[in-house]
Protein backbone atom coordinates (compact mmCIF):
# COMPACT_ATOMS: atom_id res chain seq x y z
CA UNK A 1 0.00 0.00 0.00
CA UNK A 2 2.87 2.36 0.86
CA UNK A 3 4.47 1.64 -2.51
CA UNK A 4 1.22 2.36 -4.34
CA UNK A 5 0.70 5.65 -2.54
CA UNK A 6 4.30 6.65 -3.14
CA UNK A 7 3.94 5.93 -6.90
CA UNK A 8 0.76 7.99 -6.99
CA UNK A 9 2.40 10.93 -5.26
CA UNK A 10 5.41 10.72 -7.57
CA UNK A 11 2.93 10.98 -10.44
CA UNK A 12 1.45 14.13 -8.87
CA UNK A 13 4.96 15.53 -8.37
CA UNK A 14 5.81 14.90 -12.03
CA UNK A 15 2.58 16.63 -13.06
CA UNK A 16 3.45 19.70 -11.00
CA UNK A 17 6.92 19.78 -12.50
CA UNK A 18 5.53 19.42 -16.02
CA UNK A 19 3.19 22.37 -15.41
CA UNK A 20 6.05 24.44 -14.05
CA UNK A 21 8.26 23.63 -17.03
CA UNK A 22 5.52 24.59 -19.52
CA UNK A 23 5.11 27.89 -17.70
CA UNK A 24 8.88 28.29 -17.77
CA UNK A 25 9.10 27.76 -21.52
CA UNK A 26 6.28 30.21 -22.16
CA UNK A 27 7.88 32.86 -19.98
CA UNK A 28 11.54 32.61 -21.02
CA UNK A 29 11.27 35.24 -23.74
CA UNK A 30 9.61 37.75 -21.43
CA UNK A 31 12.52 37.90 -19.01
CA UNK A 32 14.26 41.25 -19.29
CA UNK A 33 16.24 41.72 -16.09
CA UNK A 34 19.44 39.90 -15.26
CA UNK A 35 18.96 36.73 -13.25
CA UNK A 36 21.05 35.18 -10.47
CA UNK A 37 23.02 32.05 -11.32
CA UNK A 38 23.83 30.84 -7.80
CA UNK A 39 22.64 31.59 -4.27
CA UNK A 40 24.46 30.24 -1.21
CA UNK A 41 22.94 30.61 2.25
CA UNK A 42 24.32 29.75 5.67
CA UNK A 43 22.57 30.22 8.97
CA UNK A 44 21.09 28.76 12.11
CA UNK A 45 17.74 27.35 13.17
CA UNK A 46 17.24 27.82 16.93
CA UNK A 47 14.73 25.04 17.42
CA UNK A 48 12.77 22.94 19.87
CA UNK A 49 11.48 19.47 19.02
CA UNK A 50 8.69 17.09 19.97
CA UNK A 51 8.50 13.41 18.98
CA UNK A 52 5.71 11.24 20.38
CA UNK A 53 4.36 7.79 19.68
CA UNK A 54 1.80 5.37 21.09
CA UNK A 55 0.62 1.85 20.33
CA UNK A 56 -2.39 -0.37 21.06
CA UNK A 57 -1.69 -3.80 22.57
CA UNK A 58 -5.09 -4.01 24.29
CA UNK A 59 -5.59 -7.40 22.62
CA UNK A 60 -3.37 -8.63 25.48
CA UNK A 61 -5.43 -9.07 28.66
CA UNK A 62 -4.99 -6.25 31.16
CA UNK A 63 -3.41 -3.72 28.77
CA UNK A 64 -5.08 -0.49 27.71
CA UNK A 65 -5.33 1.59 24.54
CA UNK A 66 -2.96 3.31 24.32
CA UNK A 67 -0.75 0.71 25.94
CA UNK A 68 2.33 2.92 26.02
CA UNK A 69 2.83 6.55 25.09
CA UNK A 70 6.30 8.10 24.90
CA UNK A 71 6.91 11.83 24.44
CA UNK A 72 10.38 13.23 23.68
CA UNK A 73 10.71 17.02 24.05
CA UNK A 74 14.06 18.66 23.35
CA UNK A 75 15.22 22.26 23.70
CA UNK A 76 18.28 24.26 22.72
CA UNK A 77 18.84 22.38 19.47
CA UNK A 78 20.74 24.93 17.36
CA UNK A 79 20.86 23.71 13.78
CA UNK A 80 23.57 24.69 11.29
CA UNK A 81 21.63 25.17 8.04
CA UNK A 82 23.19 25.35 4.55
CA UNK A 83 21.47 25.92 1.19
CA UNK A 84 22.63 26.06 -2.42
CA UNK A 85 20.24 27.26 -5.13
CA UNK A 86 21.41 26.87 -8.73
CA UNK A 87 19.65 28.47 -11.71
CA UNK A 88 19.83 26.44 -14.93
CA UNK A 89 18.00 29.22 -16.81
CA UNK A 90 16.15 32.42 -15.82
CA UNK A 91 13.18 30.24 -14.84
CA UNK A 92 14.44 26.79 -13.82
CA UNK A 93 16.37 26.02 -10.63
CA UNK A 94 17.59 23.22 -8.42
CA UNK A 95 17.96 23.58 -4.68
CA UNK A 96 19.85 21.51 -2.12
CA UNK A 97 19.37 22.24 1.58
CA UNK A 98 20.70 20.47 4.65
CA UNK A 99 21.01 20.99 8.36
CA UNK A 100 22.51 19.22 11.36
CA UNK A 101 22.70 19.68 15.13
CA UNK A 102 23.34 18.02 18.45
CA UNK A 103 20.30 17.70 20.69
CA UNK A 104 20.69 20.31 23.42
CA UNK A 105 18.70 18.60 26.17
CA UNK A 106 15.12 17.90 27.15
CA UNK A 107 12.83 15.34 28.76
CA UNK A 108 11.23 11.99 27.96
CA UNK A 109 7.87 11.11 29.54
CA UNK A 110 6.97 7.40 29.38
CA UNK A 111 3.37 6.43 30.24
CA UNK A 112 1.95 2.88 30.46
CA UNK A 113 -1.77 2.14 30.74
CA UNK A 114 -3.98 -0.69 31.89
CA UNK A 115 -7.52 -1.54 30.86
CA UNK A 116 -9.84 1.46 30.81
CA UNK A 117 -6.91 3.85 30.23
CA UNK A 118 -5.92 3.58 33.87
CA UNK A 119 -2.40 4.96 34.27
CA UNK A 120 -0.14 2.18 35.52
CA UNK A 121 3.22 3.93 35.41
CA UNK A 122 4.73 7.28 34.50
CA UNK A 123 8.47 7.82 34.39
CA UNK A 124 10.59 10.75 33.30
CA UNK A 125 14.15 10.78 31.96
CA UNK A 126 16.52 13.53 30.90
CA UNK A 127 17.40 13.78 27.21
CA UNK A 128 21.17 14.11 27.09
CA UNK A 129 21.60 13.83 23.28
CA UNK A 130 21.99 12.86 20.52
CA UNK A 131 21.49 14.44 17.06
CA UNK A 132 19.22 15.47 14.21
CA UNK A 133 19.77 16.25 10.54
CA UNK A 134 17.80 16.68 7.34
CA UNK A 135 18.29 16.94 3.58
CA UNK A 136 15.93 18.61 1.07
CA UNK A 137 16.50 18.21 -2.68
CA UNK A 138 14.12 20.21 -4.90
CA UNK A 139 13.59 21.09 -8.56
CA UNK A 140 11.47 24.11 -9.37
CA UNK A 141 10.43 26.79 -11.80
CA UNK A 142 9.49 30.46 -11.71
CA UNK A 143 5.85 30.82 -12.74
CA UNK A 144 5.18 34.47 -11.89
CA UNK A 145 7.11 37.72 -11.62
CA UNK A 146 5.40 40.64 -9.92
CA UNK A 147 5.24 44.03 -11.71
CA UNK A 148 8.11 46.50 -11.32
CA UNK A 149 10.50 43.77 -10.18
CA UNK A 150 8.66 43.53 -6.86
CA UNK A 151 9.16 39.80 -6.49
CA UNK A 152 8.25 36.34 -7.74
CA UNK A 153 6.34 33.10 -7.22
CA UNK A 154 8.11 29.73 -7.63
CA UNK A 155 6.71 26.20 -7.65
CA UNK A 156 8.88 23.25 -6.66
CA UNK A 157 8.85 19.58 -5.76
CA UNK A 158 11.37 17.20 -4.29
CA UNK A 159 12.49 14.77 -1.62
CA UNK A 160 13.11 15.21 2.12
CA UNK A 161 15.00 12.98 4.55
CA UNK A 162 14.61 13.88 8.24
CA UNK A 163 16.48 12.04 11.01
CA UNK A 164 16.19 12.57 14.77
CA UNK A 165 17.83 10.53 17.53
CA UNK A 166 17.11 11.03 21.23
CA UNK A 167 19.00 9.41 24.11
CA UNK A 168 17.22 9.33 27.47
CA UNK A 169 19.27 9.08 30.68
CA UNK A 170 18.15 7.99 34.16
CA UNK A 171 14.66 7.15 35.46
CA UNK A 172 12.44 9.13 37.79
CA UNK A 173 9.25 7.32 38.85
CA UNK A 174 6.38 9.83 38.97
CA UNK A 175 3.35 7.50 39.15
CA UNK A 176 3.04 3.81 40.06
CA UNK A 177 -0.33 2.05 40.39
CA UNK A 178 0.33 -1.72 40.57
CA UNK A 179 -3.39 -2.43 40.55
CA UNK A 180 -3.81 -0.97 37.06
CA UNK A 181 -2.24 -4.02 35.39
CA UNK A 182 -2.46 -7.18 37.52
CA UNK A 183 0.80 -9.12 37.58
CA UNK A 184 2.96 -6.11 36.64
CA UNK A 185 5.16 -4.17 39.04
CA UNK A 186 6.80 -0.74 39.04
CA UNK A 187 9.07 1.25 41.34
CA UNK A 188 7.48 3.35 44.06
CA UNK A 189 6.50 6.88 43.06
CA UNK A 190 9.17 9.43 43.92
CA UNK A 191 12.12 7.08 43.50
CA UNK A 192 15.00 7.52 41.04
CA UNK A 193 17.38 5.02 39.49
CA UNK A 194 20.02 4.52 36.79
CA UNK A 195 21.25 8.09 37.07
CA UNK A 196 23.75 8.94 34.32
CA UNK A 197 22.91 5.73 32.44
CA UNK A 198 21.35 5.68 28.97
CA UNK A 199 18.02 3.89 29.34
CA UNK A 200 16.28 4.48 25.97
CA UNK A 201 17.49 5.45 22.50
CA UNK A 202 14.87 6.42 19.91
CA UNK A 203 15.76 6.95 16.25
CA UNK A 204 13.13 8.36 13.88
CA UNK A 205 13.63 8.55 10.10
CA UNK A 206 11.13 10.14 7.71
CA UNK A 207 11.35 9.77 3.91
CA UNK A 208 9.04 12.28 2.24
CA UNK A 209 7.90 13.60 -1.12
CA UNK A 210 7.03 17.29 -0.98
CA UNK A 211 5.49 19.89 -3.31
CA UNK A 212 5.20 23.57 -2.60
CA UNK A 213 5.64 27.23 -3.45
CA UNK A 214 8.09 29.99 -2.53
CA UNK A 215 7.53 33.72 -2.86
CA UNK A 216 9.31 37.00 -2.17
CA UNK A 217 7.79 40.48 -2.25
CA UNK A 218 9.98 43.59 -2.10
CA UNK A 219 8.57 46.38 0.04
CA UNK A 220 11.54 48.63 -0.72
CA UNK A 221 14.65 48.29 -2.85
CA UNK A 222 16.49 46.64 0.07
CA UNK A 223 13.76 45.11 2.24
CA UNK A 224 11.47 42.21 1.35
CA UNK A 225 9.26 39.58 2.96
CA UNK A 226 9.42 35.96 1.85
CA UNK A 227 7.82 32.63 2.56
CA UNK A 228 7.81 28.96 1.60
CA UNK A 229 5.03 26.43 2.11
CA UNK A 230 5.57 22.75 1.27
CA UNK A 231 2.91 20.05 1.55
CA UNK A 232 4.03 16.46 2.13
CA UNK A 233 1.40 14.15 0.58
CA UNK A 234 3.30 10.99 1.48
CA UNK A 235 5.86 10.39 4.21
CA UNK A 236 7.25 6.97 5.09
CA UNK A 237 8.28 6.40 8.72
CA UNK A 238 11.06 4.09 9.91
CA UNK A 239 11.55 4.26 13.69
CA UNK A 240 13.60 2.16 16.11
CA UNK A 241 13.40 2.21 19.90
CA UNK A 242 16.00 0.52 22.12
CA UNK A 243 15.18 -0.04 25.82
CA UNK A 244 18.65 -0.68 27.24
CA UNK A 245 17.46 -1.95 30.65
CA UNK A 246 14.99 -4.48 29.29
CA UNK A 247 16.72 -7.86 29.37
CA UNK A 248 13.57 -9.48 27.96
CA UNK A 249 13.93 -7.48 24.72
CA UNK A 250 16.46 -7.43 21.93
CA UNK A 251 18.78 -4.44 21.87
CA UNK A 252 18.94 -3.73 18.15
CA UNK A 253 16.14 -2.74 18.29
CA UNK A 254 13.68 -3.50 21.09
CA UNK A 255 10.75 -1.99 19.17
CA UNK A 256 10.49 -1.07 15.50
CA UNK A 257 7.81 1.02 13.85
CA UNK A 258 6.80 1.32 10.20
CA UNK A 259 4.13 3.62 8.89
CA UNK A 260 3.10 6.29 6.45
CA UNK A 261 1.48 9.69 6.78
CA UNK A 262 1.58 13.33 5.70
CA UNK A 263 3.29 16.54 6.76
CA UNK A 264 4.10 20.16 6.05
CA UNK A 265 7.08 22.53 6.07
CA UNK A 266 6.66 26.29 6.58
CA UNK A 267 9.24 29.09 6.34
CA UNK A 268 8.34 32.78 6.75
CA UNK A 269 10.67 35.71 7.18
CA UNK A 270 12.24 38.93 5.99
CA UNK A 271 15.34 39.79 3.94
CA UNK A 272 17.51 42.89 3.97
CA UNK A 273 19.96 43.47 1.11
CA UNK A 274 23.20 44.67 2.69
CA UNK A 275 24.86 44.96 -0.72
CA UNK A 276 23.86 43.89 -4.23
CA UNK A 277 25.17 40.37 -3.56
CA UNK A 278 24.80 39.97 0.21
CA UNK A 279 21.55 39.62 2.16
CA UNK A 280 20.64 39.10 5.82
CA UNK A 281 17.67 36.84 6.58
CA UNK A 282 15.50 36.44 9.69
CA UNK A 283 12.48 34.17 10.01
CA UNK A 284 10.59 31.29 11.59
CA UNK A 285 10.47 27.66 10.45
CA UNK A 286 8.26 24.67 11.24
CA UNK A 287 8.55 21.00 10.21
CA UNK A 288 5.71 18.60 11.03
CA UNK A 289 5.13 14.96 10.06
CA UNK A 290 2.38 12.65 11.28
CA UNK A 291 1.78 8.96 10.62
CA UNK A 292 -1.81 7.95 9.90
CA UNK A 293 -1.23 4.21 9.66
CA UNK A 294 1.45 1.84 10.86
CA UNK A 295 2.55 -1.04 13.04
CA UNK A 296 4.78 -1.45 16.08
CA UNK A 297 6.76 -4.69 16.32
CA UNK A 298 8.09 -5.97 19.64
CA UNK A 299 11.38 -7.91 19.39
CA UNK A 300 11.73 -10.22 22.42
CA UNK A 301 15.09 -11.64 23.42
CA UNK A 302 13.59 -15.13 23.19
CA UNK A 303 10.72 -16.14 20.94
CA UNK A 304 9.05 -14.65 17.88
CA UNK A 305 8.24 -10.99 17.27
CA UNK A 306 4.71 -9.67 17.67
CA UNK A 307 3.08 -6.65 16.00
CA UNK A 308 0.40 -4.22 17.19
CA UNK A 309 -1.24 -1.12 15.68
CA UNK A 310 0.76 2.10 15.89
CA UNK A 311 -1.91 4.59 16.97
CA UNK A 312 0.23 7.73 17.00
CA UNK A 313 3.55 8.95 15.69
CA UNK A 314 4.28 12.66 15.29
CA UNK A 315 7.45 14.68 14.79
CA UNK A 316 7.48 18.46 15.22
CA UNK A 317 10.35 20.96 15.10
CA UNK A 318 10.06 24.73 15.04
CA UNK A 319 11.94 27.89 15.92
CA UNK A 320 13.59 31.09 14.72
CA UNK A 321 16.03 31.18 11.80
CA UNK A 322 18.78 33.65 10.94
CA UNK A 323 21.47 33.69 8.27
CA UNK A 324 23.28 35.31 5.37
CA UNK A 325 22.90 34.76 1.61
CA UNK A 326 25.42 35.34 -1.19
CA UNK A 327 23.73 35.93 -4.56
CA UNK A 328 25.63 35.89 -7.85
Task: Give the residues covered by each predicted segment.
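Residues on the lipid-exposed face of transmembrane beta-strands in outer-membrane beta-barrel proteins
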Residues: 82-86, 135-143, 157-159, 211-217, ...
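Short gly/pro-enriched beta-turn/loop segments at secondary-structure junctions
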Residues: 204-210, 218-226, 261-263
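Short loop/turn motifs that connect adjacent beta-strands in outer-membrane beta-barrel proteins
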Residues: 27-38, 87-93, 144-153, 219-225, ...
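A structural/positional concept
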Residues: 130-139, 150-154
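Extracellular/periplasm-exposed beta-strand and loop segments of Gram-negative cell-envelope proteins
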Residues: 49-77, 100-135, 161-206, 233-267, ...
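Cleavable N-terminal export/targeting peptides
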Residues: 1-37
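Transmembrane beta-barrel strands of outer-membrane/channel proteins
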Residues: 38-48, 96-102, 141, 155-163, ...
Amino acid sequence: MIRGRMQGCIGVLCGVMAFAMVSVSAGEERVRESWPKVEFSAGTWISVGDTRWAHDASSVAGLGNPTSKLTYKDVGTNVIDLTGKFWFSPRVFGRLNGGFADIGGGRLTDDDYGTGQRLFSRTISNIAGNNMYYINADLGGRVKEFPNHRGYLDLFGGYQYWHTEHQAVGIGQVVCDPGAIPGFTCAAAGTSSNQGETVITNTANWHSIRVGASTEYRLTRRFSVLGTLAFIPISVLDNEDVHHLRGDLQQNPSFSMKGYGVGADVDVGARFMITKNLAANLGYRLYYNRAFSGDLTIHPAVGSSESFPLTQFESLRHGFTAGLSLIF
